[in-house]
Regions:
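Extracellular low-complexity, Gly/Ser/Thr-rich intrinsically disordered linkers
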Residues: 64, 350-417
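Conserved, mostly hydrophobic/aromatic
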Residues: 86, 149, 192, 219, ...
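Generic structural signal for well-ordered alpha-helices
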Residues: 132-136, 171-178, 209-220, 248, ...
Length: 417
C-alpha cells in the first residue's frame, strides 16, 4: 500500500476550516443582507460537506505488469475526477529505513505516447520516467489531487520492528526519500501501512503498544504541518484484538486520518469455510466471528476517542471466494479457495460482476453463488448503503483497495459520494 525545495501549501485542516468558515459566516451574517447571508451559509455547508468527502484510492506499483493497469487508466476511467488522494503502494521498509520498492516501475520505465497520461512519449534522456512521472502528469491535469507514498503493506511490514527502534532515523529516511529532488512535487505526504504493530501479520511484531505512536510522532515532527501523514490500520475490533494491541488513540494526534482496513474479515484462508462476506458493514445472524464487521471497527475506534473526521470508510474493489460450496446463503462449507485470475480466493470486481453476478446481500454487502463457487464483494448498490453509513457516522471520507479492481469506466468509484 512513500536539493530541498520550498514547502508547498498543504490543504487547510478540515476541522479548522469548518470552524473558521462557520464562525466567520456567523459574524458576517449579523450585518449582511439576504444575498450575502445565503452565500455565507452555502460556503459553510460546502465546508462541512468537504469534511467527509475524501476519496482515497490505492495504486499498486506492481499493477503495471500482469494487470496492465497504469496511471493513464486512472484518467481514462474517470477515476481521477472522483479522487482527492492517491496512495502509491508500496515503498519498502528495510534496515530501519524507508526504501524504494520497484525502482524500474517507479522511475525508469519508459512510456509511449499511447500509454502516457498526456499523450507525450518519454524520451531516453529525460531525468524521470515511470509511474512517478506519470503521476506528476496526472497532477498537472488535476491540480487539487494529492499523492501519498505508502510504505509497508502485508509483505514489507516486517521492517517496521527495526524502524521502531529508532523512529527519528526512520522518519528522516522517509522524508529524504519522499522528497528526493529527482521526483520533487510528486508526493504530498506519507502513508504508513504497518501490518501490524505489536501483533501478528505475515510476521509477529513485539515492539510494544507505544511503538506505533512513537513512530507516527517522529514522522509528524519530521514532515511538519505542510505534508500529509496518514496510516492504514487494523479493523480487528474484537476484545484483546489488534486494535487493542497498539495505541491508535495516542497516535491519532499525529495523523491527518486513519484508513481502517474494513475488508478481508473473512476469506478462504479458512479453506473449509464457513463462507462469509469479506467486508460486511454490519453483523448478521450466523456471522462466524463477533465484531468482525465495519460498524464494530468504527464504533471501537470512536470509543477510544479518535475523532470520526479522522476515520475513513474502507472498501475493497475485489471479492473473496470459496469453491466446493453447495449452499447459496452464507455459512456453507467449502473445499478450498475459488480460482482467481492472479491468486486463488480473490478476484477483481470487474471480473466478478459478469462472471458471477450478485445473487443476494447480507450485512450490507453482496454475495454470489455460481456453480460450486461462492463469492462476496461490494457493488454500486451496496456501496450506496455504505455511503449512507459513512455520512451518518460523520466519517472523514472513503478509501479503497485498489484502483485496478474497478471497471474500465470506474463503476465502483463513481458510486462513492
Amino acid at each position: 500500500m512513500h536539493v530541498p525545495h520550498l514547502p508547498r501549501v498543504r490543504p487547510i485542516r478540515t476541522l479548522f476550516s469548518v470552524l473558521c468558515t462557520v464562525a466567520l459566516g456567523a459574524g458576517l451574517l449579523a450585518g449582511a443582507g439576504p444575498a450575502t447571508a445565503t452565500a455565507a451559509q452555502a460556503e459553510a455547508s460546502a465546508a462541512q460537506a468537504a469534511a467527509g468527502s475524501k476519496v482515497v484510492g490505492y495504486f499498486t506499483e506492481w499493477g503495471v505488469y500482469d494487470r496492465n493497469y497504469h496511471v493513464k487508466n486512472i484518467e481514462s476511467s474517470g477515476s481521477a475526477d472522483k479522487l482527492t488522494h492517491i496512495n502509491y503502494s508500496f515503498g519498502n521498509v528495510t534496515g530501519g529505513k524507508c526504501a524504494m520498492g520497484d525502482a524500474y516501475a517507479a522511475t525508469d520505465r519508459a512510456y509511449t505516447a499511447a500509454d502516457s497520461v498526456d499523450g507525450v512519449a518519454d524520451t531516453w534522456d529525460q531525468p524521470l520516467r515511470g509511474n512517478f512521472n506519470q503521476l506528476l502528469k496526472l497532477k498537472q491535469k488535476h491540480p487539487d489531487l494529492k499523492i501519498l507514498w505508502s510504505f509497508g503493506g502485508w509483505t514489507w511490514s516486517g521492517g517496521f520492528a527495526q524502524a521502531a527502534q529508532n523512529p527519528e532515523a526512520f522518519a528522516q529516511s522517509c522524508y529524504d526519500l519522499v522528497e528526493n529532488s529527482k521526483w520533487a512535487d510528486v508526493f504530498d505526504g506519507i502513508d504508513i501501512d504497518w501490518e501490524y504493530p505489536n501483533a501478528c501479520g505475515l510476521s509477529c511484531d513485539t515492539s510494544g503498544r507505544d511503538a506505533f505512536p512513537k513512530l507516527m510522532g517522529a514522522l509528524r515532527a519530521k514532515f511538519g504541518q505542510d505534508y500529509l501523514v496518514t496510516a492504514a490500520i487494523t479493523a480487528d475490533a474484537t476484545a484483546g484484538g489488534k486494535i487493542d494491541a497498539a495505541d491508535y488513540a495516542g497516535a491519532a494526534q499525529y495523523v491527518d486520518w486513519y484508513n481502517p482496513m474494513t475488508y478481508d474479515f473473512f476469506g478462504a484462508w479458512d479453506a473449509t469455510g464457513p463462507t462469509a462476506p469479506h467486508s460486511p458493514l454490519t453483523s448478521y445472524s450466523g456471522i462466524p466471528k463477533e465484531d468482525f464487521h465495519t460498524s464494530a471497527t468504527i464504533a471501537k475506534l470512536k470509543g477510544l476517542g479518535i475523532p470520526a473526521s479522522k476515520l475513513l470508510l474502507g472498501l475493497g474493489f475485489y471479492g473473496r471466494g470459496w469453491t466446493g460450496v453447495t449452499q447459496s446463503e452464507p455459512g456453507g462449507t467449502a473445499t478450498g479457495p475459488a480460482k482467481g485470475t492472479y491468486e486463488n480466493g480473490i478476484e477483481d470486481y470487474k471480473v466478478l460482476k459478469t462472471s458471477c453476478p450478485a445473487t443476494g446481500t447480507v450485512g450490507g454487502t453482496a454475495y454470489a453463488k455460481c456453480g460450486s463457487d461462492w463469492w462476496s464483494y461490494d457493488t454500486p448498490q451496496t456501496i450506496a448503503t455504505k455511503m449512507a453509513y459513512k455520512n451518518e457516522q460523520g466519517l472523514g471520507g472513503t478509501f479503497f483497495w485498489e484502483l485496478s479492481g474497478d471497471t474500465a469506466n470506474g463503476e465502483l468509484i463513481k458510486a462513492i459520494d
